């Protein structure tokens, strides 16, 4: 798409020239005095920070802190931004983060089907699970099995910034980031209780309580306890989550919010890791049951203890300059033991004649993670000539330490079509990873959002990061790297609510990986060009976003996990369309279309893969969900909702010879509200379609979840 790149660069260059026109006009009459500074009262599109962090009314967001770190109207961000608020999460019946994002453009959620201990997310074709998720603006980085699992019950909203975010957040997923915004004190009395149970017999009880403690102190506590069976055989769980928060606000200029969370999770695994032959296509024995789980029930275990505590401090001076400090400490210990299938007996892709047995891997790990992050910001607004500057300066520090042990052991084979459990398993072998790894990262950044000429918006970002990584034990290595990232965006706000924009952004993503020759992997790098339009209609409450983008990632890892090379380049370019609307008070709609062209552009170790699509990833997605509430009459308070999700076909192999079919799924919601009580029934995969969600190679396929009904009852007072 070279013409697109040239046009975008030309537009950006013309935007820079336009920014100087008012100043040149002034210079013709008298000298421009740059040292004369005028403080502005508003440069964020009429938004406050609470709007960028707080609840979303219905389905339509207005502001975000994710696309610029300061709270700003979404229309002013020169990239695509989606927000899923609590109202939309509840309408969808989402009980996990990945369930809440199934209707969001550019996001591939649950690519392996059900996984109750991980929120798997891909954005614009790139995996955001480990390095593209954030909680309250601070990264939830994970490596190996050392990460943090966030429960959706404690989340107020989910912001998705599509495209590179390194210019704001440092090293991150090139396809975009997902920022979970915690529920926090509002200063209003809140008493909310919710109970639910699904068709598997998995039930929960949740609460959300908040109020004023004094004139200057507000509090909020939410939590959930949940337990029962899950979708596949032998899969069950018990989890408890509690998230207390307190806000101290002595005056309108100062606030300190303390946010904490404790999570306990005890479960048995969902299964998965199924072969392509036997799931997507049948073998001589037929197809493997979609509820089959080939672990050992007496062995399988997953235990998570997780804690985080931090604060957000903000003070605005009389000059309207604001300082902020966001800090969080996190701890997690995760222990797992399970058996996973890996092909058929002999580790074959297809079963030998008359042999229905699966090979299995006996896997165990013990992982402890400690993290600390501090993000310091200075924000202010000044005017130079005819240009209003919204300035942001920041310095961030991140510390990540993981102490991990991973080992495998002997495992018996098991019949894929008539499994028998309980055979003794072989002993565990010596660990192949026994490591203490530490990573320190320091980043400094600046942003200037310039507004001029009755509608022009020019946004410039720059950030430099340096990262030190040191690992002792097995394996051991030491490495440090630094990189600059930038973003430039130009937009124009018309009075009718239309805002076209163009942007270019560079990125880097430091990865922890040793290559086949013993060297350390370089950071993934690249650039994205994006052009789009955002439309906020004046005749109904809505937001429509359309975008074209061209994103290239270099230094992509290739080869097997035991012989990694870094010789690849992958390109993702395409189109995204999203509409979120509150049509009157009774109708709410969210709809999206995603169309990509995902291709391997370089692979020096295997040139036959050039031009192929990476496995697992579909190139088309589309969805629509509509909710209607009867406003009056005998059926007043009744809510009807429904949606359709389409996920296009993908491949199970690098050569693109084994296809995973596309699927269209229907969802249903029926609800009733009266006074302070409500009851809702959500049914996902309404017609109980049997399908494979995706395959990460021919040995690792996962069924999509069958029909699931969730009944919820809630009250507030």
Language-model-derived ranges and their functions:
Residues 58-82, 86, 98-138, 156:
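Extracytoplasmic beta-strand/coil segments of soluble accessory domains associated
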Residues 109, 138-162, 181-182:
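Short acidic/polar hinge/loop motifs at secondary-structure boundaries
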Residues 153-156, 167-244, 250-254, 307, ...:
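Outer-membrane beta-barrel translocator/receptor signature
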Residues 226-230, 243-316, 331-369, 412-441, ...:
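Acidic/polar loop-and-plug regions of large Gram-negative outer-membrane beta-barrel proteins
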Residues 249-251, 369, 388-392, 396-400, ...:
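Structural signature of Gram-negative outer-membrane beta-barrels, strongest in the C-terminal barrel
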Residues 314-318, 322-328, 332-340, 523-582, ...:
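Membrane-embedded beta-barrel scaffold of Gram-negative outer-membrane proteins
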Residues 550, 567-654, 690, 712-716:
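Gram-negative outer-membrane beta-barrel transporters
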Residues 645-653, 672-717:
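C-terminal beta-signal and adjacent terminal beta-strands/loops
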């Amino acid at each position: 798409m070279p013409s697109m790149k040239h046009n975008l660069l030309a537009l950006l260059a013309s935007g820079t020239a336009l920014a100087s026109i008012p100043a040149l006009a002034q210079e013709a009459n008298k000298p421009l005095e740059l040292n004369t500074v005028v403080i502005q009262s508003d440069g964020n599109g009429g938004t406050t920070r609470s709007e960028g962090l707080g609840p979303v009314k219905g389905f339509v967001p207005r502001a975000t802190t994710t696309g610029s770190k300061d709270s700003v109207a979404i229309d002013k961000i020169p990239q695509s931004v989606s927000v899923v608020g609590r109202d939309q999460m509840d309408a969808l019946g989402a009980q996990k983060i990945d369930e809440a994002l199934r209707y969001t453009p550019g996001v591939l959620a649950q690519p392996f089907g059900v996984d109750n201990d991980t929120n798997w997310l891909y954005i614009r074709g790139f995996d955001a699970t480990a390095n593209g998720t954030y909680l309250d603006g601070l990264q939830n980085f994970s490596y190996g099995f050392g990460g943090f699992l966030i429960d959706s019950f404690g989340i107020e909203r989910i912001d998705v910034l599509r495209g590179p975010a390194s210019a704001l957040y440092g090293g991150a997923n090139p396809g975009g980031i997902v920022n979970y915004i915690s529920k926090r004190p509002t200063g209003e009395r809140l008493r909310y209780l919710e109970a639910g149970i699904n068709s598997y017999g998995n039930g929960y009880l949740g609460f959300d309580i908040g109020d004023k403690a004094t004139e200057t102190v507000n509090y909020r506590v939410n939590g959930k306890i949940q337990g029962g069976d899950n979708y596949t055989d032998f899969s069950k769980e018990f989890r408890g989550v509690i998230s207390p928060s307190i806000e101290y606000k002595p005056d309108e200029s100062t606030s300190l919010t303390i946010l904490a969370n404790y999570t306990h999770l005890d479960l048995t695994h969902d299964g998965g890791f199924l072969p392509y032959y036997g799931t997507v296509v049948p073998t001589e024995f037929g197809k493997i049951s979609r509820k089959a789980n080939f672990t050992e029930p007496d062995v399988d275990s997953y235990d998570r203890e997780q804690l985080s505590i931090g604060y957000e401090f903000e003070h605005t001076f009389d000059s309207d300059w604001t300082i902020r400090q966001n800090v969080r400490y996190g701890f997690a210990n995760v222990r797992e033991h399970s058996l996973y299938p890996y092909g058929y007996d002999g580790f074959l892709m297809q079963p030998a004649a008359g042999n229905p047995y699966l090979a299995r891997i006996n896997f165990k790990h013990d992982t402890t993670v400690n993290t600390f992050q501090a993000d310091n910001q200075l924000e202010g607004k000044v005017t130079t000539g005819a240009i209003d500057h919204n300035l942001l300066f920041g310095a961030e520090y991140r510390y990540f330490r993981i102490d991990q042990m991973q080992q495998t052991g002997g495992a018996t084979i098991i019949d894929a079509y008539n499994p028998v459990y309980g055979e003794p398993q072989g002993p565990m072998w010596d660990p192949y990873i026994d490591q203490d790894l530490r990573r320190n990262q320091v980043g400094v950044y600046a942003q200037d959002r310039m507004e001029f000429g009755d509608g022009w918006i020019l946004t410039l970002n720059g950030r430099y990061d340096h990262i030190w990584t040191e690992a002792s034990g097995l394996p051991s290595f030491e490495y440090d790297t630094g990189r600059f990232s930038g973003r430039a965006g130009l937009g124009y706000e018309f009075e009718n609510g239309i805002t076209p924009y163009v942007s270019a952004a560079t990125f880097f993503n430091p990865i922890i990986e040793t290559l086949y020759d013993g060297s350390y992997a370089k950071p993934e790098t690249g650039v994205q060009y994006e052009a789009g339009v955002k439309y906020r209609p004046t005749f109904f409450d809505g937001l429509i976003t359309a975008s074209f983008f061209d994103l290239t990632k270099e230094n992509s890892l290739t080869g097997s996990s035991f012989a990694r090379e870094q010789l690849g380049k992958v390109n993702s370019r395409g189109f995204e369309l999203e509409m979120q609307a509150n049509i009157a008070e009774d109708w709410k709609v969210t709809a999206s279309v995603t169309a990509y062209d995902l291709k391997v552009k370089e692979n020096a170790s295997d040139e036959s893969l050039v031009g192929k699509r990476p496995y697992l990833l579909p190139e088309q997605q589309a969805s629509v969900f509509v909710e209607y509430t009867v406003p009056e009459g005998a059926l007043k308070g009744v809510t009807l909702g429904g949606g359709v999700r389409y996920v296009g076909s993908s491949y199970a192999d690098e050569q693109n010879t084994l296809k995973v079919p596309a699927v269209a799924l229907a969802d249903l919601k029926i609800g009733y509200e009266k006074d302070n009580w409500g009851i809702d029934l959500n049914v996902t995969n309404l017609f109980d379609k049997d399908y494979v969600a995706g395959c990460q190679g021919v040995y690792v396929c996962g069924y999509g979840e069958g029909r699931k009904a969730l009944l919820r009852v809630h009250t507030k007072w």
